[in-house]
Amino acid sequence: MPDREIVGERLRKLRGSRTLGEVASALGVTTMAVSLWERGERMPTDDMKVKIAAFYKRTVTSIFFKE
């Protein structure tokens, strides 16, 4: 199981200068969902992991499972 805090930090870094709202809108979720992922309080569903990876032009493994 991936460490939520590590994944959250990766997601924050990938977001860069984009706002939570910009990312949420692109993914079709709420800003709260993105915030919860980035704070390591929740993990996205497997389907959402695929969308996130595509949005950031990365692989699911590199974001959610790579050590």
Model-derived features: where do they sit?
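DNA major-groove recognition helix of helix-turn-helix/homeodomain DNA-binding modules
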Residues: 47-62
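A short, Lys/Arg-rich alpha-helix, primarily the initiator
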Residues: 1-17, 65
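Active-site phosphate/pyrophosphate- and oxyanion-stabilizing loops and adjacent acidic/basic residues
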Residues: 12, 21, 50
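Residues in the recognition helix of alpha-helical DNA-binding motifs
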Residues: 37, 66
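Short, Lys/Arg-enriched C-terminal cap helix and immediately downstream tail that follows
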Residues: 14, 46-47
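Key DNA-contact positions within bacterial/archaeal DNA-binding proteins
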Residues: 31-35, 42, 61
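Short alpha-helical DNA-recognition segment
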Residues: 17-36
